From Swiss-Prot:
Residue numbers covered by motif JAMM motif: 173-186
NCBIfam families assigned to the protein according to its UniProt record, in alphabetical order: PRK00024.1, radc
The protein's name in its UniProt record: UPF0758 protein SE_1336
UniProt organism field: Staphylococcus epidermidis (strain ATCC 12228 / FDA PCI 1200)
Ligand binding (Zn(2+)): H173, H175, D186
Amino acid sequence: MRINEMALHEKPRERLITYGAKSLSNVELLAILLNTGRKGFSSIDIANELLKQQSTIRDLKKLSINDLLKIKGIGLYKAVILQAAFELGERINSTSTFDKVQITHPSDVASLMMSTMKDLEQEHFVVLLLNSKNIVTKQAWVYKGTLNSSIIHPREVFNIAIRESSNSIIVVHNHPSGDVTPSKEDITTTYRLKECGDILGINLLDHIIIGDNKFTSLVEAGYFDK
């Protein structure tokens, strides 16, 4: 059934206005984002098809623009809207997660980052900015791709820390393979960042590697003692 054929009280947009967003199903919320359907298919039909692409709604964020464009009824404009909505939801979730979290152990970092990073299909490099009490004040995602010591430049990392008047930083990246063994590039990157941090007076407290529900701390592994 087309949405314009529904009774007024059954239409997703009108239901949201009357009863609030929490009263809507995932399909209805996606249908509102999609706005319109295509010939023979309503936005609700397309939303149902979209949900079939992943096992959970949280995993929708894994869909690229090209993945979304493969779904009939989703063009570039709709794909961009969806990606923006997924990213905004992720950022809101991350902001609430990081609110006044104090880092006292590498496992604290893993707890913060595991759900966000363990299923990423590419390597991402994140800088956590901390104040003098080791409370995370901000996270900065600075790189996506294959980690290489020549790509992760200390200037980019520490510019953020200086701009935010951070006392110290912790860097985090993921291994899509799930194996958290540090590579030579991981170790080289760590040494470069630690050396620059010592010069600037902004301590690199740790480098955490996130894998499949496990992690490695390069501090605990002894690399900061060398």
